[in-house]
Amino acid sequence: MASSSNWLSGVNVVLVMAYGSLVFVLLFIFVKRQIMRFAMKSRRGPHVPVGHNAPKDLKEEIDIRLSRVQDIKYEPQLLADDDTRLLQLETQGSQKIPFHAEGRHPCSLMGKNFRSYLLDLRNTSTPFKGVRKALIDTLLDGYETARYGTGVFGQSEYLRYQEALSELATVVKARIGSSQRQHQSAAKDLTQSPEMSPTTIQVTYLPSSQKSKRPKHFLELKSFKDNYNTLESTL
């Protein structure tokens, strides 16, 4: 009995030590993961180290090159007074070709595309009604290329844009003028009325014999009016 109890106590001690070691290992792993997690969040660099799983020599070379980056400095040099690029910038103001805008203005207003807005006006009763779609596309393509595009916008592109703009302005002005003339002619027709001939009022005097021949309903109406006036005066 004593030997069996000693054996059980030894087993219990071993189990307690095993469970304690397991709990300690789990706590150690958990704490280490949390520390690594907070360290990755607080650091400014990438979460994965640079050169991860790379050979040692390559990793050292990468670290050396990255450490040199912060020492690299570049001082821009000003252009000379007789530099051709500076002369081109000074003479651009006298050219007839417009500049490329800096892109500070949005391409659409209030969430609506200007191209679709002009195309919708073609189907309404406005001066833009019936304007060719190709004309609107040419005009807006040139405008967007000059303002927002990164390509070349030279003399030929500007002349094409100016031609489309002049054609659209001519069409709109012609239709506005025709509509104004129609309104003026309609207003003129309304203001001009035919001359009225002078009206003559004819008064016919009845003889005394016919004055007493009044209709019966007229006499009844007169008697009712007299009775009403009498009643109103008494009240």
UniProtKB/Swiss-Prot annotation:
Major location category of this protein: membrane
Function statement: General regulator of phagocytosis. Required to uptake Gram negative bacterium by macrophages.
Protein name per its UniProtKB record: Protein C1orf43 homolog
Naturally occurring in which organism (per UniProt): Rattus norvegicus (Rat)
Keywords: Golgi apparatus, Membrane, Mitochondrion, Transmembrane, Transmembrane helix
Transmembrane annotation, as ranges: 11-31
Subcellular location: Membrane; Golgi apparatus; Mitochondrion
Bilayer topology annotation: Single-pass membrane protein
